């Protein structure tokens, strides 16, 4: 409203005696003028005071280099010869927004009635129509409404000609009312003119149409005046938001506009309790007591509780538990975003900040708290302007301004340490991350607040679990923040579970929505009879839903009485939230999962034939980790699989990822042949600063950060550059790795598998003694001999500090012919499955299977020749037949070998030779 009136008024005509004026233009008035000048809309004009039909005074208001009052006075002095009459000084500058709205509405009423003037009756209608001010409330309480008042006004003065001039003047009585309203404001000791003062001026004038309207409506002017003065007295605290210089009681209007009083919030009990942090609060108090440079700066990682220390200081001040140097002071947190917001013109930001500093200096009881203090640097800076930090520097050094800053270590280094002048004005106070025990105490201190918010209870075990599990599994955040978030989200989860509607109520609710849609459709079609029937049905269903909800509440209340206090957040709920955040199963092992873990070897052997030692080692490691017995500071396990090519080293890692972690994609696979050169090693942790790819992160570190619970396969480890092994030392020992950006990546929940072909030559030489033709004891002793030889060769290739950190070095056996036959069955099944998608049923004979095994068996190369044999003998033959259209969708195909050893592919209708056992026929 202020903006519209600012255009409609020719303000300088309302001002006189600029030498005597004590009132400077308010921010709101100036902003209104600027806005309206920019808009250039054709608003209402108001005349009646001398000199209103002159040049565009809004342009005068916009001239740079002058404050609001100077601009107004300049405009008045240029026309002093014509402005003979003495007019109330700076009147409209002191109108509140509600009073401005009243005048605007009065003009609208004049236009509505077709009158070329604004009289006392229009001001009365404006007072009633404004609706929210003291005047409107008093008139409403007297039974006066806008409709009746309009009728009375029209009875008394009738309607006008209909032609309304562009400029609507005030009648002499209306001008007298405005002058009397200013007088009433002065008598009440107010530095502003509100709607209540306009009403008092109207009553005091006592004559005119408005007085007759009030009389006709049965209102007693004396009674109205009494009510207005009473309400003004009651709301004395709430009228401080004024236009102009504001209420004399408010010494720090700028600070209140752009800051929040933490001490007041502490007195009202709105701040969370601060547990611990005594040394930091005492150090802050100590620094605040200094004569100069008394500005502590809290530095710590995000989430360790820097802001909580400022709140703790505010609580101590509120409780009087502080030394006399800061006793009775107010801690006010400054919103830098709000301070900068809206400063469109040069110098506005600096003006706000200087006002704020002046208020702090004059009050002498303000401690300013700036969260994210690094935002001072560059705030408000434009071409040729200076930023907030440079404006504040002199005051910070001389001790005129007590300021507590808070920022993170990175931001402090990046912004504040770069400016030594600013750095020396702040005294750093390090805020370390609390320990797990301290975090538990903090959670117990906050427990009551979260119980009230979520309407439930937390067990001690839940709080302890939140601290411990967040510390162990959430590595990229800091205590107590991550533990508090766990507690909060667990409370939200439990509350939502208990707040759900009963199933019957949900069904009824769906039906109600359907009925409402149908009812609206009938109403649109004006079929009100049907709509009425549906409305009755809707009401019945809603009553049923209410009854079901009430019944549920009664049942939960009964449960509450038996179980003390309703829903309870337990350790299980905290574990569930940790699992949902990280993907790491930390909840207790269920019966089904226990069975799965105990039978893990059998399941893996369905895919991995032979290699009992490796399968058992993997299974033991997973079981150990799942029940929580593994070392919490090391990876789940780290293995090196050594052996000849094609015996299942990589396949075992894939099988584990598919079985236990959900899919083969859950595995992070790094082919170490890609890291053969020295400069490629940096790809694991990310390029160093200044190199291409620095922002992308490392292939290994980024993958583990996104999926902390997984299998990491380093395939063909011996192909990597030796520098890779140096990098892996800290992963194997401490379960951590620092990437190129300095972030620590947690490997404590990963299973590390390295495959290697080192020692395959030794195995090949001794391989003839390891076979199915030997008895068990001979096989075992031969395996142990080969294992020791391979281990010796590994020691020659890898450095001892690398091998010493591995949990186990597992040597894979060469595959026997029987094992190759089992692998052939698995590979043939894969072909059957691929053909099944094309609706072709395939069977192979025993002779064909033996032929495949004979051609595919090679102890030195493992199972890979078998894959090539199947490709050549089966897949190639099938492909030719399918292209020749001899095999079509829906056919049943049998593959056999004739007496000459040639592969023959027969359609099922051509005759059935000896078929494969059922296991291999799909």
Curated annotation (Swiss-Prot):
GO terms for cellular component: chloroplast. SMART domains: AAA (SM00382), ClpB_D2-small (SM01086). Residues 509-544 form the UVR domain. It is found in: Plastid, Chloroplast. ATP binds at residues 300-307, 643-650. Residues 92-234 form the Clp R domain. Its main location: plastid. The keyword Chloroplast applies. Residues 95-160 are annotated as: Repeat 1. Residues 255-502 are annotated as: I. It holds the Pfam family AAA_lid_9. The keyword Transferase does not apply. Residues 1-72 form a transit peptide. It comes from the Eukaryota. CDD domains: AAA, RecA-like_ClpB_Hsp104-like. GO terms for biological process: cellular response to heat. Keywords: ATP-binding, Chaperone, Chloroplast, Nucleotide-binding, Plastid, Repeat, Transit peptide. Gene3D superfamilies: 1.10.8.60, Clp, N-terminal domain, P-loop containing nucleotide triphosphate hydrolases, UVR domain. Residues 170-234 are annotated as: Repeat 2. Belongs to the ClpA/ClpB family. ClpC subfamily. This is Chaperone protein ClpC, chloroplastic. It comes from Pisum sativum (Garden pea).
């Amino acid at each position: 409203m202020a903006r519209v009136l600012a255009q409609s008024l020719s303000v300088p005509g309302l001002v006189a005696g600029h030498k005597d004026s004590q009132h400077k233009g308010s921010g709101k008035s100036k902003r209104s003028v600027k806005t309206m000048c920019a808009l250039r809309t054709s608003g209402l004009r108001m005349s009646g005071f001398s000199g209103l039909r002159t040049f565009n005074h809004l342009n005068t208001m916009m001239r740079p280099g002058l404050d609001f009052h100077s601009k107004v006075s300049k405009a008045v002095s240029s026309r002093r010869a014509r402005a003979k009459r003495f007019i109330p000084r700076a009147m409209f500058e002191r109108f509140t927004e509600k009073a401005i709205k009243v005048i605007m509405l009065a003009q609208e009423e004049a236009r509505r009635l077709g009158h070329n003037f604004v009289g006392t009756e229009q001001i009365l209608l404006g007072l009633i129509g404004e609706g929210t001010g003291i005047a409107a409330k008093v008139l409403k309480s007297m039974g006066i409404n806008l409709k009746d008042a309009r009728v009375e006004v029209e009875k008394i003065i009738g309607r006008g000609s209909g032609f309304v001039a562009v400029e609507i003047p005030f009648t002499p009585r209306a001008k007298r009312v405005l002058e009397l309203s200013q007088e009433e404001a002065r008598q009440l000791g107010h530095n502003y003119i509100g709607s209540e003062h306009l009403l008092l001026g109207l009553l005091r004038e006592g004559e005119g149409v408005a007085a007759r309207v009030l009389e006709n409506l049965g209102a007693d002017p004396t009674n109205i005046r009494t009510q207005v003065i009473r309400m003004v007295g009651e709301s004395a605290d709430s009228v401080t938001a004024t236009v102009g210089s504001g209420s004399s009681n408010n010494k720090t209007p700028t600070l209140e506009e752009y800051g929040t009083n933490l001490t007041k919030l502490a007195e009202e009990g709105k701040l969370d309790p601060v547990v611990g942090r005594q040394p930091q609060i005492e150090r802050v108090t100590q620094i605040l007591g200094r004569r100069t440079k008394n500005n502590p700066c809290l530095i710590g990682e995000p989430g360790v509780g820097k802001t909580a220390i400022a709140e703790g200081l505010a609580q101590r001040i509120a409780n009087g538990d502080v030394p006399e140097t800061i006793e009775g002071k107010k801690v006010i947190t400054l919103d830098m975003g709000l301070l900068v917001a809206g400063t469109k013109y040069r110098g506005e930001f600096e003006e706000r900040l200087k006002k704020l500093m002046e208020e702090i200096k004059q009050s002498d009881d303000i401690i300013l708290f700036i969260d994210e203090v690094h935002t001072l640097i560059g705030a408000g800076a434009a071409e040729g302007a200076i930023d907030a930090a440079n404006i504040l520097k002199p005051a910070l050094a001389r001790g005129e301004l007590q300021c507590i800053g808070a920022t993170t270590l990175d931001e402090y280094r990046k912004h504040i340490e770069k400016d030594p002048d600013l750095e020396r004005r702040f005294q750093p106070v390090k805020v370390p991350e609390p320990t797990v025990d301290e975090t538990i105490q903090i959670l117990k201190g906050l427990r009551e607040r979260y119980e009230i918010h979520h309407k439930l209870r937390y067990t001690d075990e839940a709080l302890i679990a939140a601290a411990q599990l967040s510390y162990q599994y959430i590595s990229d955040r800091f205590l107590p923040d991550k533990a508090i978030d766990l507690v909060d989200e667990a409370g939200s989860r439990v509350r939502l579970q208990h707040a759900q509607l009963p199933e019957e109520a949900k069904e009824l609710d769906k039906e109600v929505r359907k009925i409402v849609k149908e009812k609206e459709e009938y109403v649109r079609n004006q079929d009100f009879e049907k709509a009425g029937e549906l409305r009755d049905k809707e009401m019945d269903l809603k009553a049923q839903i209410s009854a079901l909800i009430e019944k549920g509440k009664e049942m939960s209340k009964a449960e509450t009485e038996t179980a003390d206090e309703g829903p309870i957040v337990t350790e299980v709920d905290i574990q569930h939230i940790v699992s949902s955040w990280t993907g790491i199963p930390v909840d207790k092992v269920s019966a089904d999962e226990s069975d799965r873990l105990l039978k893990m070897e059998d399941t893996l052997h369905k895919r991995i034939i032979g290699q009992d030692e490796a399968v058992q080692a993997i299974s033991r490691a997973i079981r150990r980790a799942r029940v929580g017995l593994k070392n919490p500071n090391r990876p789940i396990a780290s293995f090196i699989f050594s052996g000849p090519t094609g015996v299942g080293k990589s396949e075992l890692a894939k099988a584990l990822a598919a079985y236990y972690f959900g899919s083969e994609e859950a595995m992070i696979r790094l082919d170490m042949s890609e890291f053969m050169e020295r400069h490629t090693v940096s790809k694991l942790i990310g390029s160093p600063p200044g190199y291409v790819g620095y922002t992308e992160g490392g292939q290994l570190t980024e993958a583990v950060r996104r999926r902390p619970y997984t299998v990491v396969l380093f395939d063909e480890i011996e192909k990597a550059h030796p520098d890779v092994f140096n990098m892996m030392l800290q992963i194997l020992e401490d379960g951590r790795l620092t990437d190129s950006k300095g972030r620590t990546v947690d490997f404590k929940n990963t299973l590390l598998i390295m495959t290697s072909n080192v020692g395959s030559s030794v195995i090949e030489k001794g391989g003839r003694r390891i076979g199915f033709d030997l008895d068990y004891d001979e096989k075992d002793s031969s395996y142990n001999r080969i294992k020791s030889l391979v281990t010796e060769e590994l020691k020659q290739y890898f450095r001892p500090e690398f091998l010493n950190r591995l949990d186990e070095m597992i040597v894979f056996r060469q595959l026997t012919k029987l094992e190759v036959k089992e692998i052939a069955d698995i590979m043939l099944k894969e072909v059957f499955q691929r053909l099944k998608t094309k609706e072709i049923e395939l069977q192979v004979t025993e002779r064909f299977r033996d032929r495949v095994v004979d051609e595919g068996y090679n102890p030195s190369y493992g199972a890979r020749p078998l894959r090539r044999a199947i490709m050549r003998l089966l897949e190639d033959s099938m492909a030719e037949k399918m292209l020749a259209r001899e095999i079509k969708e829906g056919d049943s195909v049998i593959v056999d070998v004739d007496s000459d050893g040639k592969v023959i592919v027969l359609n099922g209708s051509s005759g059935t030779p000896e078929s494969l056992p059922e296991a291999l026929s799909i």
